[in-house]
Amino acid sequence: MKVRVRLAPSPTGTLHIGTARTAVFNWLFARHQGGQFLLRIEDTDKERSKPEFTTNILEGLKWLGLNWDEQPIIQSQHVDDHRAAIQKLLDRDLAYRCYASETELEAMRETQKAQGKAPRYDNRHRDLNPEQEAAFQSEGRTAVVRFRIDDDATISWKDLVRGPMHWKGSDLGGDMVISRRAPAKEIGDPLYNLVVVVDDAAMSISHVIRGEDHIANTAKQLLIYEALGLPIPQFAHTPLILNSEGRKLSKRDGVTSISDFQAMGYTAEAMANYMSLLGWSVPEGTDERFTLQQAATVFSFDRVNKAGAKFDWDKLNWLNSQVLHDLPKDQLLHELKPLWSKAGWALPEENWCLDLAELLGPSLTLLKDGVDQARPFFEEPTLQADGLEQLAVDGAKAGLSNLLDQLDRTSWDGFDVKQAQQLLTNAAQAANVKKGVIMKSLRAALLGRLQGPDLITTWGLLARIGQDLNRLRRCL
């Protein structure tokens, strides 16, 4: 059997991390099996679906490296196929028109609640005779189409994550609406559970991999597969992503959109790596840091957890820092340059920028940190409290004054590290303080603070653009 999986996002919002994690699991399984990863845009919600959300979803998947193997299917372009399937069910008496008004249905639900029962459709129009239907039609009533569900039916499947699953027809809330209201003898807009069955069959989907919040939908859809005589795929229901309190991650928890993570400075490699670990355990002896291609070689559903996966910011930050630390300086500069330009900085020559990227790389957690940490290299720094305190230490300014005098008398071809170290030693001796005092004071003068990357390299970079002497003079 050829493995064909699909991601089927609705363009009613930006690419959510839950949808992206589902995409990662689908992609990993397809690549591990030598199969195909497909994309279907479920845009049948006409009011909420927007082209800009489709663009955001596609761009987010591309950014993560989740390439798909065929042209994306646009669900709304296949509505005639969906209506044809509904008509087939009507013709076989496996579905029927329900004329109950919204007011009547709400009254039904309120009565059920008052009786302590779970709200469900009571199948009141399941067996209307022609005269009853004609009477409703003469009133001008519109109708939904409902799919018949036998309360005594048992729905079973072997879930690739959860094992054997069993549902009763009585658990599904009564006969299921499969199309919206429309005038009598017409079929309104087809609804989700019918539509995805028709589309998955048309796309020859072999495995449906999605979140556990779809388990009840799977039970309903299996009945539709059987009623339409369509081949039934295998199902895998992955765990939900949870917040720190153990509840489903939602917009109320803050950042959940992939484009937001991207804007915050997370790399595609770290995001894809982390999402792979949200609910999947790597085989023993396997490093938790990997590329998608590496993960695909060992991915299997027997290591996907049933329990929800808590979102761990610390782990994501660690993974992102490791990616940034290991990036070659040219690749890191490629990521940082647009951010530096956006900050309004005129960039010096390429080699200087490469050396700055290399200097900052080991201290970055997020790409945006590369803006904050680069700022004193492009802008005159403001002395922070710790910098001011350091410059007030006995001998600090005397040492810097001596260093400045030495620099005024020094002629070097480029910045010489050994010579720079000797100048610091000389300044410390002249001021009768430890060399560390001079080094801290120099850092305060150059960067405005005591925290920062390697001092000598920092000094060298600023010297190359003629900023070291200016900053020393400012502090004296």
UniProtKB/Swiss-Prot annotation:
Its EC number is 6.1.1.17. Keywords: Aminoacyl-tRNA synthetase, ATP-binding, Cytoplasm, Ligase, Nucleotide-binding, Protein biosynthesis. GO terms for biological process: glutamyl-tRNA aminoacylation. Its main location: cytoplasm. It is found in: Cytoplasm. It comes from the Bacteria. It holds the Pfam family Anticodon_2. It catalyses: tRNA(Glu) + L-glutamate + ATP = L-glutamyl-tRNA(Glu) + AMP + diphosphate. ATP binds at K251. Coiled coil: none annotated. GO terms for molecular function: ATP binding; glutamate-tRNA ligase activity; tRNA binding; zinc ion binding. SUPFAM superfamilies: An anticodon-binding domain of class I aminoacyl-tRNA synthetases (SSF48163), Nucleotidylyl transferase (SSF52374). A motif ('KMSKS' region) lies at residues 248-252. A motif ('HIGH' region) lies at residues 9-19. The keyword ATP-binding applies. One of its GO terms (cellular component) is cytosol. Catalyzes the attachment of glutamate to tRNA(Glu) in a two-step reaction: glutamate is first activated by ATP to form Glu-AMP and then transferred to the acceptor end of tRNA(Glu). Belongs to the class-I aminoacyl-tRNA synthetase family. Glutamate--tRNA ligase type 1 subfamily. NCBIfam families: gltX_bact, PRK05710.1-4. Monomer. This is Glutamate--tRNA ligase.
